[in-house]
Design a protein with these regions (language model features):
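C-terminal substrate-binding subdomain of Rossmann-fold SDR/epimerase-dehydratase oxidoreductases
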Residues: 105-222
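Structural signature of beta-strand start/N-cap positions in the alpha/beta core
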Residues: 26-27, 78-80, 147
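Conserved Rossmann-fold NAD(P)-dependent oxidoreductase catalytic core, especially the SDR/UDP-sugar
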Residues: 14-56
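Active-site Tyr-X3-Lys motif and surrounding loop/helix of classical short-chain dehydrogenase/reductase
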Residues: 1-7, 52
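Structural element of the ATP-grasp superfamily
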Residues: 16, 68, 101, 196-197
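NAD(P)-dependent short-chain dehydrogenase/reductase
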Residues: 43, 54, 66-137, 163-169
Length: 222
């Protein structure tokens, strides 16, 4: 549904960007995504490499980044783009991958796993993300202009490991149905976070085992 992404990610984003321009807001942080890299052949993906989105969602995020870059250039705005890599954690959207997994494993519902579970993701715990954003907001002076960061742990985890981790915590087995690879899906995400660590001095990323346990305990899924 390309129109849905255009209405939300492009038109909605443009409305906010215009408000930032008109109100002369000092710092504008916006959400981008690891999907801008598409199925990269080079890992870990760096902020400076060529972007090749594989789906409409990723394409809209590239458009937003370029829009922010031009607004920064022509209207002297300070825009900071955050390329989030598979953020998960307590109180997450129920339609996202990990919350759906937790719910379906708990109630023994059928889980559709694409590409035989061979996907790999750079999972980033939500509390880490909150701390990073706080540090970035506090750090940057008014002269930042436009800058982009990979917001990622820098660690790659196989989807099957996530499933096994949830099974272990909940002490339940999953009901898996393996399906073929979906169009536009990325086989792997793995970001380089050197720039992020340098500018925030944040290095204590939550590992997937701890993140899953905290998510389940805080959401009282057991």
């Amino acid at each position: 549904q390309p129109r849905k992404y255009i209405d939300s990610n492009i038109q909605g984003y443009f409305n906010i960007l215009e408000l930032v321009r008109k109100k002369r807001i000092n710092k504008f942080f916006y959400a981008s995504s690891s999907s801008v890299y598409g199925n990269s052949k080079s890992f870990p993906t760096k902020e400076t490499q060529q972007l090749k989105p594989e789906n409409f969602y990723g394409l809209t995020k590239v458009f937003n980044e370029k829009n922010a870059e031009l607004y920064s250039k022509y209207f002297k705005l300070n825009c900071i783009g955050l390329r989030f890599f598979t953020v998960y954690g307590s109180l997450g959207r129920p339609d996202m991958f990990i919350p759906k997994l937790m719910n379906k494993i708990k109630y023994r519902k059928k889980i559709d796993i694409y590409n035989k579970g061979k996907h790999h993701r750079d999972f980033t715990y939500v509390e880490d993300v909150a701390k990073i954003i706080y540090k970035l907001v506090k750090k940057f002076p008014k002269s930042t202009k436009h800058k982009i960061y990979n917001v990622c742990s820098g660690k790659v985890v196989n989807i099957k490991k996530v499933i096994l981790g949830i099974e272990k915590i909940l002490k339940k087995s999953s009901n898996l149905r393996y399906l073929s690879l979906q169009k536009g899906d990325m086989l792997k995400t793995h970001g380089e976070n050197k720039l992020l660590r340098k500018d925030t001095n944040f290095n204590k990323f939550t590992n997937i085992e701890t993140g899953l346990l905290k998510s389940i305990e805080l959401d009282k899924i057991k």
